[in-house]
């Protein structure tokens, strides 16, 4: 990365007119690809049936097709929330989806409103992950489920040519203050939390982990001895590229601490 250029781009993205213009060209995960949306829905539905459920999806970007599939499969209601308006409230309403924008902190939703919360490759972009995880716990009903797939890679490397597979976690080379100075205002920002840090956040919020599935980067594992910037992490944290979790809000608060 050319650090001065990265910092300048980040500063420019702090101006609303420029950010709004750039938003038109954002790639947000599924990008309304119906086939991909169906696969993500099947992933979610494999953890818990959607029939009769009130569902919230966090960070859908341009893709409301996953929630449309949920409604077609028997969900009672579907709500989407994001930090940027990738579609309008009216467009979502036509699909029978309630659409909200939030500030990345408090969810403008009632406590105990949902049975299911979904998120696909969005949590890694959270600027305030501990706050949002706590908010997920608040808006879930007791016995409710959170399913999230979190991509732990450096998103600024995605889509580039001549990128080595060993650069998957290149973002971890930089101290937090410098990373934030380069990326905070940009869609390629990631919070760089590792698997164990996510699991700690979920536990501290009160969730019970029902399932946790990890994908390992074989490329990183094969060259790990040479990647000294990763040596401060445990082996699991150093090589895990994706973690998918299924979490439950306990029926009784006492169960969360057991």
For the regions a language model picked out, list residue spans one by one:
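A short glycine-rich, Lys/Arg-flanked "PGG" loop and its adjoining helix->strand segment in the class I
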Residues: 130-145
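A short acidic, Gly/Pro-enriched loop at the edge of an enzyme's catalytic core
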Residues: 105-117
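A C-terminal cap/extension of S-adenosyl-L-methionine-dependent methyltransferases
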Residues: 92-94, 99, 196-204, 208-258
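Conserved class I S-adenosyl-L-methionine
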Residues: 52-62, 145-175
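Class I SAM-dependent methyltransferase SAM/SAH-binding core
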Residues: 65-105
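A short SAM/SAH-binding and catalytic strip from SAM-dependent methyltransferases
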Residues: 115-128
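Acceptor-substrate binding/catalytic loop of class I
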Residues: 180-196
